[in-house]
Curated annotation (Swiss-Prot):
It comes from the Bacteria. Belongs to the universal ribosomal protein uL13 family. GO terms for cellular component: cytosolic large ribosomal subunit. One of its GO terms (biological process) is negative regulation of translation. Keywords: Ribonucleoprotein, Ribosomal protein. This is Large ribosomal subunit protein uL13. Part of the 50S ribosomal subunit.
Length: 142
């Protein structure tokens, strides 16, 4: 009996919508990353993108536990000497709530071209409205 290998052209991808309101950031991100990789499917193949599309709404209502709201730091660099920037969770969630979830999920995906393709299937929006109603996403309870 041969081992089954999924073909990229035969993979069926579904659309799911996840409500981040009141969810813990890390627990939400691990489930989303697993779904983007396709590990929940029986036809999962490590070298093929078998994951689904995930639409996250209410990104500004995600929460963290303990003192992480003030202690958790996000770093960026301008590329110039001494150009490192630092912002904590509270300020980033107020300025760009989508980036908090995107950063958490991206860190849980493979660091290669396949991981970048998986990351492109993640759509994060603040508020309950999203432009993907034509895809008829199913609600995913996490």
């Amino acid at each position: 009996m041969k081992t089954f290998t999924a073909k990229p052209e035969t993979v069926k991808r579904d659309w799911f919508v996840v409500d981040a309101a009141g969810q813990t950031l890390g627990r939400l991100a691990t489930e989303i990353a697993s779904r983007l990789r396709g590990k929940h499917k029986p036809e999962y193949t490590p070298h093929v993108d078998t994951g689904d599309y995930i639409v996250v709404i209410n990104a500004e209502q995600v929460r963290v536990t303990g003192a992480k709201a003030s202690d958790k730091k996000y770093y960026s660099h301008s590329g110039f000497p001494g150009g490192i920037k630092e912002i904590n969770f509270e300020k980033l969630i107020a300025r760009a709530p989508e980036r908090v979830i995107e950063t958490a999920v991206k860190g849980m995906l493979p660091k290669n071209p396949l991981g970048r393709d998986m990351y492109r299937k993640l759509k994060v929006y603040k508020g309950a409205a999203h432009p993907h109603t034509a895809q008829q996403p199913q609600e995913l309870k996490i």
